[in-house]
């Protein structure tokens, strides 16, 4: 099982909340009210890992390997919520447990392979965002936290990539669906950012007091459109590997989708 190897790799790389985060060194005076506001929203958004895990266990019910991995993913993602909450508490913020159920969502069932692809792309993008936030955060401990979370998200993306490789190896006809979802996810803008927490109807972010906070932060800390190129490169690298074709741009990806569709139709008819 892929899970066996991932368990060891992730355990080896895992950071410790009690020893690796310098909570005693936090200087709340360096944070503006806006940073506190946005950080609180990021913290609450991370709580959505609970709802995503429920979705994964439901939609991948027969896939023991993947569901086993999701148990690790859930633990690490909920630690993201916890470290941000503990940070905010050190800055004088409080969280009322009664407010949390209002954020709960049940995601509608969807094609499992598309969900898997969406989350691979989403982890790549969130790592990119957190890396930018780590460079702009005004408080040193917070900069370190964002850097740590970004590294986690990249590791999670690599784990999803392993399951996408397995899917194509076991069922090659699923490749066009993977490519189409990747193309859709690549086409993201600051004003309409694509991440699993923003694209459902309603979305996780829709449940928040300030549902536009991600767009605002991106326009402040990642202005323009060129900043997405590293995300595109990483997504296209995996799609190139799965397709066995060099894909250097979204247009290349679109052309590959068009080329594969007739083959899939013929295979299905046969």
Can you annotate each of these PLM segments?
Residues 1-270:
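Non-heme di-metal
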């Amino acid at each position: 099982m892929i899970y066996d190897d991932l368990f060891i790799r992730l355990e080896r790389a895992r950071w410790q909340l009690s020893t690796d985060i310098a909570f005693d060194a936090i200087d709340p005076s360096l944070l503006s009210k806006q940073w506190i506001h946005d950080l609180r929203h990021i913290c609450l958004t991370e709580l959505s890992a609970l709802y995503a895990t429920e979705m994964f266990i439901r939609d991948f019910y027969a896939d023991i390997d993947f569901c086993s991995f999701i148990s690790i993913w859930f633990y690490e993602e909920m630690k993201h919520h916890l470290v941000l909450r503990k940070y905010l508490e050190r800055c004088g913020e409080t969280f009322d447990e009664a407010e949390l159920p209002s954020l709960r969502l049940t995601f509608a069932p969807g094609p499992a392979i598309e969900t898997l692809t969406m989350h691979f792309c989403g982890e790549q993008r969130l790592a990119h965002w957190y890396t930018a936030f780590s460079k702009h955060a005004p408080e040193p401990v917070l900069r370190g936290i964002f850097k740590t979370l970004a590294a986690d998200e990249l590791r999670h993306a690599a784990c999803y990539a392993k399951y996408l490789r397995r899917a194509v190896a076991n069922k090659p006809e699923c490749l066009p669906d993977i490519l189409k979802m990747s193309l859709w996810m690549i086409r993201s803008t600051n004003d309409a950012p694509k991440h699993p927490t923003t694209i459902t109807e309603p979305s996780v972010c829709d449940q928040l007091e300030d549902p536009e906070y991600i767009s605002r932060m991106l326009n402040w800390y990642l202005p323009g459109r060129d900043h997405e190129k590293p995300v595109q490169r990483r997504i296209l690298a995996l799609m190139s590997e799965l397709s066995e074709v060099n894909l250097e741009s979204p247009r290349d990806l679109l052309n590959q989708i068009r080329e594969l569709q007739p083959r899939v139709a013929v295979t299905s008819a046969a």
